[in-house]
Amino acid sequence: MVPLMSRLVRRWGARAVGLVLTAIGLYVVFPTLLTVFGSWPRLRDIAVWWFIVVVALVVGSMASLWWLTRLALQQRTGPDGAWSTVSWGTAASAHLAGNAAGKVVPGGPATAGVVQARLLIQSGEPPSAVASAITAMGLLTTGILLMLPVLTIPALLIGPPPAKQLELGLVMSLAVAVVMVALSTAILVWTPFVAAVGRASGRVLHVVKHDATAESVSATLVRSRDRVVASFDERRTRAILAATGNRMFDFAALVAALAALGVHARASEVLMAYCVSQALALIPITPGGLGFVESGLTTLLVLVGVTPDQAVVGTLLYRLIAFWMPIPLGALAWAGWRINLHLRRPARPTREVGPED
């Protein structure tokens, strides 16, 4: 009886705690969600073409990850050493299904990675290659996200006054993307620079975590960089472009959602709000940071000068397309992938029935 109870506790205990934490988290952020979704009627005041722009930018963000997946899984095959990789359809289906799972099930990126890996492996990709690819993609996209605040701080200090139209933020996203590509390339090819960044980060981290030294953090950062370089090899420039495109298209979608409301704010301040919201999305308490992102984003937008009404409606438009739209798309992608997998699977041979049967 005791071993049975022990197995049940080990199997379901962590899940029960996770569900309780999720329920508490949703209870805390429920008023914010109610306020955001309560502004639904205001969406009718937005021109239709702004919806098209935001959808196109979000699709561009997702397509960048599909491209990154194809680059990470590219390998030489055959006697002539030709390059081969997963199809666009498989890469898209795996990402959409994983992304949807990460937005529905608590666990976020971890859940998304497991589902994405499962689809890629069942599509015929070697498990070791898939594990290496997903790890490298995670390191690269996380590095790009961590780089954004570093580039945002100088822009906040020397940035121009608020523009009459936030559409200039779309131009800023392009400029930031160029700087990020250049800086990321330097990180991947210049080891002394990576080591110096690691030592500087280690000194800061040592203040709050005494067992972390400058040299240990530097060595860890160099090892992580080497894993990314080994995974993408000579395709690293394209990989940087894809990872940067994923973030900057997503940021541009937020800018477009606010521009649709005639918001007047510095694009650099909106970028900082975006960075914080993406960090909140990593909180594993609620699926995809649901509620925490809405609360943090609306609060920060108000702090940078956006009116409360515009902040709520802009957040609703952005999250409606960037968070909620991919969920049904992921379900459809998973269903389509299952049907396609079943159709491609060879029929099971049948045995002729003889008289003795």
Go through each PLM region and give its residues.
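A short amphipathic helical element positioned immediately N-terminal to and/or at the very start
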Residues: 37-45, 120, 220-232
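Alpha-helical transmembrane segments and their immediate interhelical loop/hinge regions
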Residues: 214-261
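Transmembrane helix-loop-helix hairpins in multi-pass inner-membrane proteins
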Residues: 1-40, 98-211, 290-357
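Membrane-interfacial helix-loop connectors
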Residues: 76-77, 258-283, 287-317
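Short alpha-helical transmembrane interface motifs in multi-pass membrane proteins
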Residues: 22-23, 50-54, 97-102, 210, ...
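Short helix-coil transition sites and intra-membrane helix breaks within transmembrane domains
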Residues: 59-74, 102-114, 282-293
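Hydrophobic/aromatic residues in alpha-helical transmembrane segments
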Residues: 25, 35, 64-72, 116, ...
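Membrane-embedded helical hairpins/re-entrant loop segments and their flanking transmembrane helices
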Residues: 64-97, 258-273
